[in-house]
Design a protein with these regions (language model features):
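Short, flexible coil/linker elements and helix-boundary hinge sites characteristic
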Residues: 29, 70-71, 89-98, 122-129, ...
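C-terminal catalytic region of ATP-dependent kinase domains
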Residues: 172-181, 187-354
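Conserved kinase catalytic-core segment
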Residues: 128-197, 201
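Conserved ATP-binding subdomain of kinase catalytic cores across diverse folds
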Residues: 1-121, 126-127, 153-161, 168, ...
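General helical secondary-structure elements
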Residues: 9, 16, 34, 78-79, ...
Length: 354
């Protein structure tokens, strides 16, 4: 899906989140937003961040879903958007503060209709039974885990630690992966979509930067390079989702010492609807959640392997496309500035022997 330009006088409505720099932009009085505009934390040079955003999006788009398409705002687009957005919010609002923050690099992406996510925890850290049940229903589908495996293959390559954090992955135990951001596992209908593939918050060492010379993100790349690590990594990811749900179903405690109290009761079990007409409901005990997704390890692993293979084919095709033609033993000079794969991606490919 193409990302529409922000032209002068085209912005007719802007809404935004209060907790993070995310805005929804309506163009030309259309009935729904056309764009999402998001502020990414700057880590290093602006051009490095822009290259990383573009290439992370390209890879996820080709491996996972054509709706994934992120592009940095052009300066003229930023000016048009900011003028409209400033008028939409009170000067002391969180949205206005985000717009004035010089630490963000602003990107745009198409607005995806009917988008949902796997976040089941409220802002006050409480958990609703209905939200838990809905998330359980989503993760009890084989296709979800296969899609998620493909998304995570790209995440491993670009060092996106904002879905799963694998920095403490223990291959021997099949553990050590955490579900880093519940809201960053997103769905269009019953399918997982890998929006927001670039994550800079923990990339200060250059690991998340696709435009750098050093091949960073080595722990993630090692999982991609060694097929023997992948089954245990797949198990660790399914366990990460189980562990988070199991923990949150146990309620939440508040206060200290004698004043400590449970502000949300434990969910001993939940009953969910299923897609099976012969067994329309399923009772899930909290204790069973610990191993609930183990049967989906093979689906996640299949997606991970397929995603890695598709990513390799895509990048090798790009490498061939951008290579300068050779005639008479010499490379012809380019008639115009040459397109190229960022050095950081080439280094990652070399590390993976691609």
């Amino acid at each position: 899906m193409a990302v529409r330009p922000i032209l002068p006088r085209s912005v007719t409505r802007v809404t935004g989140l209060s907790e993070r720099p995310v805005f929804f932009v309506t163009l030309n009085n259309e009935p729904q937003p056309a764009l999402v505009v998001k502020g990414e934390n700057k880590v290093g040079d602006d051009e490095d961040v822009k290259a990383s955003v573009r290439w992370a999006s390209k890879m996820m788009k080709n491996v996972n879903n054509p709706l994934v398409n992120s592009k940095p705002l052009m300066p003229e687009e930023w000016n048009v958007f900011k003028r409209a957005a400033i008028l939409a919010f009170h000067p002391t609002s969180p949205q206005s503060r985000n717009l004035q923050n010089p630490g963000y690099l602003w990107i745009k992406m198409p607005f995806v209709a009917n988008l949902s996510d796997a976040d089941f925890v409220n802002e006050d850290a409480t958990t609703n039974t209905s939200d838990v049940k809905e998330v359980l229903r989503k993760f009890l589908r084989e296709q979800v885990w296969r899609d998620l495996g493909k998304v995570v293959a790209v995440d491993l390559f670009v060092c996106n630690l904002d879905r799963f954090d694998w920095e403490n992955f223990d291959e021997a135990q099949g553990r050590g992966v955490t579900w880093a951001n519940r809201g960053n596992i997103m769905f269009v209908g019953a399918n997982v979509i890998g929006l927001d593939p670039y994550f800079a918050d923990r990339g200060g060492d250059g690991n998340a930067n696709l435009n750098k010379v050093r091949p960073g993100a080595q722990s993630g790349l090692e999982i991609l390079r060694d097929p023997l690590k992948r089954p245990q990594f797949a198990l660790a990811c399914t366990r990460a989702v189980s562990d988070e749900l199991y923990s949150r179903m146990g309620g939440r405690m508040q206060g200290q010492g004698q004043n400590r109290r449970q502000v949300r009761g434990e969910m001993a079990y939940v009953v969910i609807r299923t897609d099976d007409p012969n067994n329309p409901t399923l009772r899930i005990e909290r204790e069973d959640v610990k191993d609930l997704f183990n049967p989906f390890v093979d689906e996640f692993l299949g997606g991970l392997n397929a995603g890695a293979d598709e990513l390799k084919r895509y990048l090798l095709a790009k490498k061939t496309k951008y290579a300068r033609p050779v005639m008479g033993g010499y490379r012809n000079p380019n008639p115009a500035p040459a397109k190229s794969i960022p050095q950081g991606i080439q280094d990652r490919m070399n590390f993976l022997h691609w």
